[in-house]
Amino acid sequence: ELQVRLVRFGYSIAACRDPVMMRITATSLSQEHLVIACSLTGITPELLGAVELARSYGAPILAITRADSPLARLADVVLPLQGAETSFIYKPTAARYGMLLAIDVLATELALAHPEDNQERLRRVKLALDDYRGGDDHLPLGD
């Protein structure tokens, strides 16, 4: 979701889910890059290792995770998640919705930082998708 949001605003972004690719990507980063690490728990060993590597090469870290987690302690900036989970396992986790909200807030703030440029970018995305999908003018800006 974060990749889809940020690429619309012209950001070069690579979403890595594979632990080997996370480590390889981390070694290519510097202080000119930003790592945005998203984790509902903040304790996944593979993610923590990649973030530590990126940090060792000078990349700043923004974490969207639990405020009291190891990932949060590695980050320069934290967008904290605090989802009150229950034992009812048949519903989506509250933390998942918190993650989506944090991504929405981050994407909105980045969009508003350069409103004219981003309005034009979003217009282009909308036209390209409408042309491709053949739908009416009221379809979502995405998919």
Model-predicted segments: where are they?
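Glycine-rich phosphate-binding loops that contact phosphosugars or nucleotide phosphates
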Residues: 1-101, 107-112
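Internal, active-site/partner-interface "lid" segment
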Residues: 112-143
